[in-house]
UniProtKB/Swiss-Prot annotation:
Protein name, as recorded: UPF0303 protein RHE_CH02903
Gene3D superfamilies cross-referenced by the UniProt entry: Haem-degrading domain
Membership in a protein family: Belongs to the UPF0303 family.
SUPFAM superfamilies named in the record: GlcG-like
Native species: Rhizobium etli (strain ATCC 51251 / DSM 11541 / JCM 21823 / NBRC 15573 / CFN 42)
Upper taxonomic lineage: Bacteria, Pseudomonadati, Pseudomonadota, Alphaproteobacteria, Hyphomicrobiales
InterPro entries attached to this UniProt entry: PduO/GlcC-like, PduO/GlcC-like_sf, YBR137W-like
HAMAP family according to UniProt: UPF0303
Pfam families found in the cross-reference section: HbpS-like
Amino acid sequence: MTIDNDLSRIAEQEKALSFDAFDLTTAWQLGKLLQELASERGLGIAIDVTLHSMPVFYAALPGVTPDNVNWVRRKRNMVLRYFRSSYASGLKLSKDGKTVEDNGLDGADYAPHGGSFPINVKGTGCIGAVTVSGLPQRDDHNLVVEALALMLAKDLDTLRLSPL
């Protein structure tokens, strides 16, 4: 897979994984689904669902460290800044040979790494972010996509990024 292929697939994900409506209950359901998937697989991840800059769901599973908490914050900041997945932002920066600092951002506050995904509502746009941290960045991204696909009854096989 090339960066261009991944960026194209992520754009498809961001379009397909949009909600008709999204509220506090939906946010909780999404967070709980991620927690269940991670627990079943023995994954030590931090999970955050933020809606309108308000934390709605947070869980830290066994194995999470304070570093993961900071990664969640920094990845979420990328989504809330650019309204696209943190992984797509990182891939685009890599493709262009740039850093977040080149865009006037502080790397201590913005992490262009996989694991945060915009919560998009059709006709409205980005209203928040769902973020995980604890796995390699591509796996973090794919886990979030899997949970969104399950919630929205979308075919994961057509959306998931292929393994490297």
